[in-house]
Amino acid sequence: MRIVTVISLMLAVPDAATASGWYRRALGATELWNLGSVIGLEVQGAPFFLAQPESNRWESPVVLGTTTVRVEVFVDDPDTFLSGAAAAGAEYHDPIRDHEMPWGTHRQGGFFDPYGHLWLVGDKSPLRRPA
């Protein structure tokens, strides 16, 4: 069995349980496991994690007043994905629109979640390898 390398992220949130509920409603995330202050989630097979940053020398974007990472999600239907986040209270960063790229048209837009994290949502075209 080949194990694929996965790069994931852990998002700082003030309350992991509350944040988990939001991501499940907004993004259709499912919970992998729950340790209380640290929770594993996945969206369409892509894992990510939530943690309360208590005494860990890191902080949430809301506390810092800025974000240093943008979360990029590549899905089959970015319009529906972004609409679900907006319906759950996400703040639009950029509506889904077509971007002309060297490989063709790429549909992408974005939102800020309630915890200050910037999410860009696009189709899977950047993941395709040229023939």
Where are the model-predicted features located?
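Short, surface-exposed ligand-recognition loops at beta-strand->loop->(often short) alpha-helix junctions
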Residues: 11-15
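Conserved ATPase active-site switch/coordination loops adjacent to the nucleotide-binding site
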Residues: 115
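Vicinal oxygen chelate
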Residues: 1-10, 20-112, 122-131
